[in-house]
A protein has these predicted regions:
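Short, non-transmembrane alpha-helical segments in secretory-pathway proteins
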Residues: 8-41, 76-109
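Conserved histidines in hydrophobic membrane contexts and catalytic metal-binding motifs
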Residues: 29, 46-72, 79, 88-145
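Hydrophobic membrane-insertion alpha-helices, especially the h-region
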Residues: 1-8
Length: 145
């Protein structure tokens, strides 16, 4: 029975790497950033892969804990030090008027914390908008892929 349970667990973990990455990132954020109440998870792939856990710390401050793919480096950003996820989405909707927003992720681009919004243009083409977390300014725009 133990062997069957172990085999099922290994199979389930192998089939669900995103859940494994999320669980690992939450554990790192809780240990190194004193994250108390996780409420979001983002996976960012650009020049490198980053996992971000959002939530509240022990002082009840909103934080983002940005973790590199290896899990050996974590950086904490106060949510109040930049634009919110909703602000990033609002800017995307108002300036780009997309057909549909497909995804939004928090990550690191050119050593800056960023929001990356993936959307479909009105013509249905894939687009990427990268916004500076601290200023909300556009860092990169890739359109009509």
């Amino acid at each position: 029975m133990v062997i069957i349970g172990s085999m099922w667990f290994i199979y389930h973990q192998a089939r669900n790497p995103a859940a494994t990455a999320e669980t690992r990132a939450i554990n790192i954020a809780q240990k190194y950033a004193k994250l108390q109440h996780p409420d979001g998870f983002y996976t960012y792939h650009r020049n490198a892969t980053y996992y971000t856990v959002s939530g509240k710390d022990v002082d009840n401050h909103g934080i983002f804990v940005l973790i590199n793919e290896k899990g050996n480096h974590a950086t904490v950003y106060r949510q109040s030090s930049g634009i919110s996820k909703n602000d990033a989405l609002e800017k995307t909707w108002s300036t780009k008027k997309p057909q549909k927003v497909l995804n939004i992720n928090f990550g690191l681009y050119q050593s800056k914390p960023v929001w990356e919004i993936v959307y479909r243009s009105v013509k249905g083409r894939l687009c990427y908008l990268t916004l500076d977390f601290k200023t909300g300014n556009t860092i990169q725009l890739i359109e009509n892929i």
